[in-house]
């Protein structure tokens, strides 16, 4: 479990776009794309990366089942940069694009890029050596 508690608003990266969920929201079910979940309570915002999954919204609860999620404050930048480099190195060797190994490495690269983007965009006082270029 990454987060549990009462909040004022949850912003999710839904398949059809970013969506803000307030208390007493109408029920819905949505898939999640790679992106950021923002949880705000009393003007304090926590941000999490999410690498796909689903969200179920009920009037008084939001449940997220994610393939991967983490609080941006817990991201180890060095580790994310190393994972990104390893994935790029493997992909550069020319794995066939239709293999499970290729898809797994591609997903690892996307997760690393997401972590590094989260740090750049949202974490205060942290600099990454990642340039954002592929």
Tell where the protein language model's regions lie, with residue ranges.
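Acidic/glycine-rich phosphate/pyrophosphate-binding loops and surrounding catalytic core
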Residues: 71-134
């Amino acid at each position: 479990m990454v987060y549990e508690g009462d909040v004022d608003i949850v912003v999710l990266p839904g398949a059809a776009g970013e969506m803000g969920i307030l208390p007493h929201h109408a029920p819905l079910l949505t898939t999640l794309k790679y992106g950021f979940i923002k949880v705000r309570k009393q003007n304090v915002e926590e941000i999490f990366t999410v690498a796909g999954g689903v969200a179920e919204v009920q009037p008084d609860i939001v449940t997220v089942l994610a393939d991967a999620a983490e609080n941006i404050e817990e991201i180890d930048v060095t580790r994310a940069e190393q994972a990104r480099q390893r994935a790029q190195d493997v992909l550069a060797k020319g794995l066939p694009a239709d293999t499970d190994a290729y898809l797994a490495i591609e997903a690892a690269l996307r997760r690393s890029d997401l972590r590094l983007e989260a740090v750049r965009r949202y974490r205060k006082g942290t600099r990454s050596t990642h340039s954002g270029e592929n």
